[in-house]
């Protein structure tokens, strides 16, 4: 802030926008990161420092194995490569965007979570984490 310029990149998740069955703490934590980033972005407005929250969906990293998610539809059908996610994050950071959702499928997922009732999105989330 003292320099009048800076960039902050926080890592959220599409799980910030809708429930993650069997992983509620993860979803709640990522919702916090998204909300915190938004608040910080507004607090720093006019200082030259921007805050970006990158919200990827399923990404081909060691996380899926450690979280026991490799067998789920989410990681079988909708996984992105980490390089592609990183490129989205870098571009959003460079442009000073507040949030960035990586991938078309993930963007549609986030839009559906914003516009559809939980009675629709919750079963979708459950379907994605089932085998």
Question: Where does each model-flagged region fall?
Answer:
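Active-site loop immediately N-terminal to the catalytic Tyr-X3-Lys motif
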Residues: 20-24
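Residue(s) in the substrate-gating loop at a strand-loop-helix junction
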Residues: 13
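Helix-to-beta-strand junctions that scaffold the AdoMet/dcAdoMet cofactor pocket
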Residues: 1-3, 45
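Conserved catalytic-site region of short-chain dehydrogenase/reductase
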Residues: 16-18
């Amino acid at each position: 802030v003292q320099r009048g310029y800076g960039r902050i990149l926080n890592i959220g998740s599409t799980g910030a926008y809708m429930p993650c069955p069997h992983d509620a703490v993860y979803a709640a934590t990522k919702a916090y990161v998204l909300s915190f980033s938004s608040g910080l972005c507004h607090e720093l407005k006019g200082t030259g420092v921007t805050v970006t929250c990158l919200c990827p969906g399923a990404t081909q990293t060691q996380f899926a194995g450690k979280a026991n998610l490799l067998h789920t539809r989410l990681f079988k059908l909708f996984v992105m490569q980490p390089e592609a996610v990183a490129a989205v994050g870098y571009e959003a950071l460079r442009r000073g965007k507040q949030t960035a959702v990586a991938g078309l499928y993930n963007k549609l997922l986030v839009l559906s979570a914003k516009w559809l009732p939980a009675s629709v999105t919750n079963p979708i989330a459950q379907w994605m984490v089932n085998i």
